[in-house]
A protein has these predicted regions:
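Membrane-integrated ABC transporters
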Residues: 1-44, 59-71, 89-93, 97, ...
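Transmembrane helix-loop-helix hairpins at lipid-water interfaces of multipass membrane proteins
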Residues: 30-88, 165-170, 268, 281-285
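An intracellular "coupling" helix at the cytosolic face of ABC transporter transmembrane type-1 domains
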Residues: 28, 117-118, 134-143, 147, ...
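ABC-type nucleotide-binding domain
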Residues: 341-506
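Transmembrane helices of ABC transporter permease
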Residues: 25, 29-42, 75, 148-199, ...
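Alpha-helical transmembrane segments of multi-pass membrane proteins
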Residues: 78-97, 148-155, 176-200, 255, ...
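Helix-loop-helix
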Residues: 60-73, 163-177, 247-320, 325-326
């Protein structure tokens, strides 16, 4: 079931209270806007009085040219005032609405940036986009028209009631008796209308998510010749949206029909009761004309409010969906007494660390104790789902530990500011994301203000300088959306260059060579070794390639959230049975030596290179002979 159907709806009064602080910022503009609205309203109210004066004068046979000119001049002046007030009301009101929309979108985006990975794991980007674009546009219209409409309606209804009572109290009471009944029906239909609009907004978010998925994955779509699958997914989403929108229009039709019926009822009452009053001399012809005009004004005002209900409910829906974003708790945040992280060496300690995801009670990490020395090059290996990536995601606090603690140079990561922590930890994801822009902009992304020389130096250290200079526009080459104009290896090296430009003391790399060919893998691993060797950066490398793990100073084997082995490559790789039990590919040289030991040899299993293996075999053969 969709969120539109399961979440309880907040009251309109609650939503308006959430919205008022944004409007209060522009209360001066709002006051002038309402002043202009009052002027236009008074001008509208004056017209029936002019017509009554003119009609009564005619009936008294006292009409003169002077009277006509005076009334015409008054009407002309009122229309000039009305036109000027309408101009400012329309322009200033909409501009105020745009300012409010901008402020709300800024706050929503700022809040989205502070939300953690869990929120994005469970929320479609298409839904988020709908909330900060279409929904807030409806809020703009609401912010402008809502105060105006209710202010104008209040003046017109009150003025009409007073003036109509002056003409005929009994007739006025009969006419206004229809209003409460109309209000009850309108409130009931309004609730249904709001629910339809919410469902409509949710469904357009789902459709946006489907479109985004298909367009961003168009290379995969074409690779699998899956255009028909995507067409069907889109068609289904489109049909669902069509169905919801059809139901919305049915609700609107019922709403508008009820309005017209009540309009007709009020006119019927006026014609019947007013005509009888005129016949029996209870009201003059001029008063009846004015009465009909004021009733028309009253009915037009009520109809305008009722028609505004659609826009009102759209605005309420937009505010509600905005509030849902703002009410999403920020679970990863600075502690009240957080201090900047001070990194001198770059040592990392995991002290009895356990972790489980918020929406899953299965422990992903179980009492992990691990000390990574400053400047050490560590490889994490193990099967998929063993906890390697999760362990590394805890270092920059993409998630918080559920047990134990993580220390960097003796400082608990939960006690330091996120900005300083993530500025000291460089992270290169397996699925590299480059922003739409130039190579230079992507390298400098984590360090705004970096000079061109610093950008080029970072690229050189990452092994990217040569290929970047060979591009058509060098460092000013546009990389395309998500870096589609670069190869996998090029994107990886640009990403590493971006991390280097940050000047971190620790780098975490999650399968950085998973999608590269052997040549690309060699270049990336050589870059990592150079960073570790020349700059003393602590390196944590997650990899499935044992040939890469061999080159690390230390290898840690993980499975089911636990550390199974920890040591140098020559200490870990001889544990053939352990490695194979967790699905790891043991180096061929080690497997050869291990097999020989199974048939009676007693060979050391730490000969990792081909040359070392050959030397061990020659020595063993010599000893046998």
């Amino acid at each position: 079931m969709s969120e539109a159907a399961t979440n309880p709806r907040p009251k309109n009064s609650t939503l308006i209270r959430r919205f008022l602080p944004y409007m209060a910022k522009y209360r001066g503009v709002l006051a002038f806007d309402l002043f202009c609205a009052a002027l236009t309203t008074l001008c509208d109210i004056a017209l029936p009085s002019i017509m009554r004066t003119l009609t009564n004068t005619v009936s008294a046979a006292a009409l003169t040219v002077e009277t006509v000119l005076r009334l015409a001049a008054l009407y002309f002046v009122l229309r000039i005032i009305d036109g000027a007030a309408s101009y400012f009301m329309s322009g200033i009101g909409h501009i105020m609405g745009v300012h409010i929309e901008t402020d709300m979108r800024r706050d929503a985006f700022d809040h989205l940036l502070r939300l953690d990975h869990t929120y994005y794991n469970n929320t479609k980007v298409g839904q988020i986009m709908g909330r900060i674009t279409n929904d807030l546009f409806d809020v703009t219209e609401f912010a402008h028209h809502c105060p105006e409409e209710f202010f104008i309606a209040g003046i017109k209804i009150a003025a009409s009631f007073v003036i109509l009572c002056q003409a005929s109290v009994p007739l006025t009471l009969v006419v206004f008796a229809c209003v409460p009944l109309m209000g009850v029906v309108s409130v009931k239909l309004n609730r249904k209308l709001r629910e339809r609009f919410r469902q409509q907004r949710f469904q357009i978010g789902e459709l946006n998510a489907t479109i985004e998925d298909s367009l961003l994955g168009q290379r995969v779509v074409k690779a699998f010749a899956a255009e028909d699958i995507e067409r069907e997914k889109f068609a289904q989403g489109n049909r669902d949206f069509e169905q919801i929108k059809t139901l919305s229009y049915h609700a609107m039709a019922a709403f508008n029909t009820s309005t017209r019926l009540f309009d007709g009822l009020m006119y019927f009452v006026v014609i019947l009761a007013g005509g009888l009053s005129l016949v029996y001399g209870a009201i003059s012809a001029g008063d009846l004309v004015a009465y009909v005009l004021y009733v028309s004004t009253l009915i037009a005002t009520i109809r305008r409010i009722v028609e505004f209900a659609e826009q009102f409910q759209r605005g309420m829906t937009g505010i509600e969906r905005f509030a849902e974003i703002m009410d999403t708790p920020v679970t990863i945040a600075d502690a009240p007494d957080a201090k900047p992280l001070v990194v001198k060496d770059g040592g990392i300690d995991f002290d009895d660390v356990s972790f489980e995801y918020p929406d899953d009670h299965n422990k992903v990490l179980r009492h992990v104790d691990l000390h990574i020395r400053p400047g050490e090059n560590v490889a994490l290996v193990g099967p998929s789902g063993g906890g390697k990536t999760t362990l590394c995601n805890l270092i920059p606090r993409f998630y918080d530990v559920t047990g134990g603690k993580i220390l960097i140079d003796g400082q608990d990561v939960r006690g330091v500011t996120l900005h300083s922590l993530r500025g000291a930890i460089g992270v290169v994801q397996q699925d590299v994301y480059l922003f739409s822009g130039t190579v230079a902009e992507n390298i400098a992304y984590g360090r705004p203000g970096a000079t061109r020389a610093e950008i080029e130096e970072a690229a050189r250290l990452a092994g990217a300088d040569a290929f970047v200079r060979a591009l058509k526009d060098g460092y000013d080459t546009y990389v395309g959306e998500r870096g589609v104009k670069l190869s996998g290896g090029q994107k990886q090296r640009v990403a590493i260059a971006g991390v280097i430009a940050m000047r971190p003391r620790c780098i975490v790399l999650d399968e950085p060579t998973a999608m590269l060919d052997p040549h690309g893998r060699e270049e990336v691993i050589s870059t990592i070794e150079r960073l570790n060797r020349e700059m003393g950066i602590t390196v944590v490398l997650i990899t499935h390639h044992m040939t890469e793990a061999i080159r690390a100073q230390r290898v840690i084997v993980m499975d089911a959230g636990r550390i199974l082995a920890d040591g140098t490559p020559k200490e870990v790789f001889p544990q053939v049975e352990l490695l194979e039990s967790v699905g790891l590919t043991v180096p061929a040289t080690t497997k050869v030596l291990y097999a020989l030991n199974q048939v009676g040899f007693d060979l050391p299993l730490d000969a990792l290179s081909t040359e070392e293996c050959a030397q061990v075999l020659l020595a063993a053969i010599g000893a046998k002979t």
